[in-house]
A protein has these predicted regions:
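Acidic, metal/ion-coordinating pockets
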Residues: 1-210
């Protein structure tokens, strides 16, 4: 949600992000607050891929890419970006009239098998949060589909090594069913860190998540 601002001048922010050297990014719901052409202009200023596999325009991810692969120490990292499907409930219709917002669950069912097959480590970057308590499974909000993080874990934890979340502005760093889960606060106040160990045959173990 920090990618664009109401000043209608995104260059100062994107310049900072480019200097930080991110491998990929994902859009949040507030990125749509200032119309689609401005958002696309901002994305084009970035030197890394912005992933959003579940928001579609002309039969493809509206950012141009939903999945990205890159190498770290000989390991293939496969990443998919997803954003809460609930944006049409808040946003001005004219700003998003060319877009289709799909469920993160629906998109993962389609894309995750291939992503898992091609990757040593699978990272799901989801601008959405958790609709249920991670320990008890009890609902923490109305189950509207705005947040699908708990259901993502329930259905796909065997195929996901890292689940990066957001939207709810919570401080979460934990491991559930061998999936590292982080949600590093809001407004750039926290940084999430996940440390992996791996063997020569590329068997990956999560060492820490904080």
């Amino acid at each position: 949600d920090l990618l664009v601002s109401k000043l209608k001048s995104s260059l100062p922010l994107t310049s900072i992000y480019n200097r930080l050297g991110f491998d990929f990014g994902t859009v949040g719901n507030h990125e749509f607050n200032y119309d689609l052409p401005y958002l696309k202009q901002t994305i084009n200023q970035l030197h890394y891929p912005v992933l959003c596999a579940n928001i579609i325009e002309n039969a493809q991810p509206f950012t141009g890419q939903g999945i990205h692969y890159f190498k770290v120490n000989g390991l293939t990292i496969g990443t998919i970006g997803l954003t809460t499907q609930y944006i049409p409930h808040w946003e001005q219709p004219d700003y998003i009239k060319t877009l289709t917002f799909n469920s993160a669950i629906h998109t993962l069912k389609s894309e995750l098998p291939t992503l898992r097959e091609k990757s040593d480590i699978v990272v799901v970057s989801y601008h959405g949060g958790f609709e249920r308590d991670l320990d008890s499974g009890l609902p923490t909000e109305a189950l509207t589909g705005e947040n699908e993080g708990y259901d993502i874990l329930r259905q796909f934890s065997d195929s996901i090594d890292v689940l990066i979340t957001g939207h709810q502005h919570r401080d979460i760093a934990t491991i559930k069913n061998q999936t590292a889960i982080i949600q590093p606060g809001s407004k750039g106040t926290k940084v999430g860190k996940i440390v992996f160990e791996y063997t020569h045959d590329k068997k990956v173990l999560i060492k820490e998540c904080n």
